[in-house]
Amino acid sequence: MADTKYNSIHPGELWLDTDGNPIQAHGGGIIYINDTFYWYGENKEKSKPGSGIWHWGVNCYSSKDMYNWKYEGIIVPPTTEDDKDPLHYTQCMDRPHIIYNDRTSKFVMWIKVMNKENPNIQQMVVLTADNILGPYTRIRAFHPLGMNSGDFDLVKNPSDGKAYIFFDRIHSEMICADLTDDYLDVTGFYSVHMPNVPPFVREAPAFFERKNKKYLFTSAITGYFPNPTETDMFDCFHLPMTKLENPHRGAKAANSCFSQISAVFKYPKADDLYIAIADRWLIDVPPELDYLGISAGLYGDGTHPVIMEEDEYIERAAKFNRPDTRDTSKARYVWLPIRFEANTPIIEWYDEWKIEDFC
């Protein structure tokens, strides 16, 4: 298995590192440094049904070609003693994001943590390091703007180095907030976008910019079950956004190719290649279970009245989101290229694709 070598990307299939082990880097992103790609994310290897283990730290991998990834280790280890600590392995740590601060020469990582006992309590943990591989020093754990902050993305404006955070103020709206110059806090200035109610309110923001247009991919709130991606386009931070159509095309559009986007990576060796980095959290969901049925099971909101009458269907659907039955240790990755029709991003399914074919 250690001799496995890839020369293409196979979305949704098991992806092994250069040691022959399944890659564990969920909900994170990719950063390019000195001709090397670094892929970081949640380590879910121990998150098996009924284990009580939500995560086992933040992993990082390195690669020269984005096909073959070397395991560099756990760059943020879990806390194992104090179960009240936000980084304890039973706490719901998700979606690490890293940006580099040129002023302080620090790598700055933010991590979302949902309280294991009360999911309505969510905060951020901020850490810094001199090297992408650590060691990382914890700076603070806090509620930005005094809010319970859910899924998020960090954004660094390459023109002036100013940074922003997009996060979902849980179950209500999307927030765009300015970061301080050291990227360790928010300034207090923010704007509000996409207000709604579950399951339609947006989460999992993934930002990218192309040809002076800014974009945000988001998903609805259906636990780990996939749903249609939404695209919003805007000209400047804090200005109103224009809602576009679902970027996914074809038969897999309604469930975003059975995935949830965590980041969009602009490939640095091509002029116009953007890659949607997504997780397939659940690999064994029957295709007849659709996201509206899951929504009905989760929220009982009447969005799927026929299925609302089918208790057996709802029970089957809801079980895939329960900690005692779901198995995120088996989660996989769905990486797909993004093409554009004018200013509209399009994501199409490929069983296999090569980066070189899009450069």
Language-model regions: role of each:
Residues 1-359:
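Carbohydrate-active catalytic/glycan-binding domains of CAZyme proteins
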